[in-house]
Design a protein with these regions (language model features):
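Enriched for short, Lys/Arg-rich terminal
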Residues: 2-7, 64-99
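Amphipathic alpha-helical interaction segments
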Residues: 28-29, 41, 68, 92
């Protein structure tokens, strides 16, 4: 039997999630929750488009839907945090300078 990979636990960012969820549609909530579960179980890079934040080591954006991203931070001891949830256009630290 193969060793089971340890899941990451959400350690910070619940207030961000709750604030965003108060105005989000059920479809958007389901998509974000799916992405967060993928971060937790380590499959996010296989299931979603991921954009590394080159300015902040250990943080990346998960593209959830058109114009909806979740920014997460990866921390020691198998934990992660939610940094931002919202539109791609308003996301912090994301510079998509496409010519």
């Amino acid at each position: 039997m193969a060793a089971e990979r340890r899941r990451r636990r959400l350690s910070m960012g619940m207030a961000c999630l709750e604030k965003w969820a108060a105005t989000a549609s059920q479809v958007e909530k389901n998509a974000v929750y799916e992405a967060l579960f993928a971060v937790s179980d380590g499959s996010v890079r296989q299931s979603h488009k991921v954009l590394d934040d080159v300015q902040r080591n250990g943080e990346y954006f998960v593209v959830v839907r058109d114009n909806l991203v979740v920014k997460v931070g990866i921390h020691p001891f198998n934990t992660f945090s939610i940094v931002y949830i919202g539109s791609l256009d308003d996301s912090p630290d994301l510079d998509l300078d496409v010519a």
